[in-house]
């Protein structure tokens, strides 16, 4: 079975746009370990725009679509190489896969994307998926790839979707603003969290917040796929999520 793991901009890029090398080291080491244990892992990454902005010396996220697209074009290759080199050090081959919303809406495109991803997994290659921001339009505001990750999980009939962020999971309030916020370890029914004020806080470079992650978990759950939202900066969090250990917030399906 397949596991889809999504890394948000907040754990890929630091506030100044530099790559969070330590976090990428941590996550890629876990992916390599899972790969060695027979898991089929697909990575979905954000961060191309953030990386491009850093390389181009931009301090603020551009508002113009063409500038966002150009920044993504500058950053995407460098971002992929960051994954490729780390996975390659553990003898795991990586492949870059860029998708747009239309690839997941047009039947022929969807079938081709699924066939390609399936072949890569059969070859024991780890796909590194990102949205093709250079040709996308409205998709650039598509929730920091949370929905893309959910759709890839559905397409590949994954057993688990893991959304890695920079906080421990879904809380009763924003833990960065409320010290009394408590971690919600499991959600089995969306009505359980209907009354929560789920924030849209993001990194300076991303667009996805906890709200989009919860929505992505709901989308995956409707197709029978469990989702775990957890802290990607914590040692072993991805490994524990895949093993079914208590980590972050698990949305049962």
What are the residue ranges of the model-derived segments?
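C-terminal catalytic "cap/lid" subdomain
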Residues: 1-253
């Amino acid at each position: 079975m397949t596991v889809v793991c999504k890394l948000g901009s907040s754990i890929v890029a630091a506030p100044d746009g530099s790559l969070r090398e330590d976090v990428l080291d941590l996550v890629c080491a876990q992916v390599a370990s899972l790969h060695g244990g027979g898991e089929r892992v697909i990575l979905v990454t954000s961060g191309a725009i953030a990386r491009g902005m850093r390389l181009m010396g931009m301090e603020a996220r551009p508002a113009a679509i063409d500038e966002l697209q150009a920044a993504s074009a500058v950053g995407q290759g460098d971002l992929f190489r960051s994954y490729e080199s780390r996975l390659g050090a553990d003898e795991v081959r990586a492949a870059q896969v860029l998708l747009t919303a239309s690839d997941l809406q047009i039947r022929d495109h969807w079938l081709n994307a699924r066939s390609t991803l399936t072949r890569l997994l059969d070859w024991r290659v780890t796909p590194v998926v990102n949205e093709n921001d250079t040709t996308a339009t409205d998709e650039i505001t598509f929730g920091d790839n949370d929905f893309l990750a959910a759709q890839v999980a559905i397409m590949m009939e994954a057993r688990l979707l893991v959304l890695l962020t920079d906080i421990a999971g879904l809380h009763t309030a924003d833990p960065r603003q409320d010290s009394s916020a408590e971690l919600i370890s499991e959600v089995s029914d969306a009505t359980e969290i209907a009354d929560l004020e789920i924030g849209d806080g993001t990194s300076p470079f991303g667009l996805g917040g906890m709200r989009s992650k919860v929505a992505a978990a709901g989308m995956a759950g409707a197709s029978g796929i469990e989702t775990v939202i957890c802290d990607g900066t914590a040692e072993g969090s991805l490994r524990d999520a895949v093993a079914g250990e208590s980590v972050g917030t698990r949305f049962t399906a």
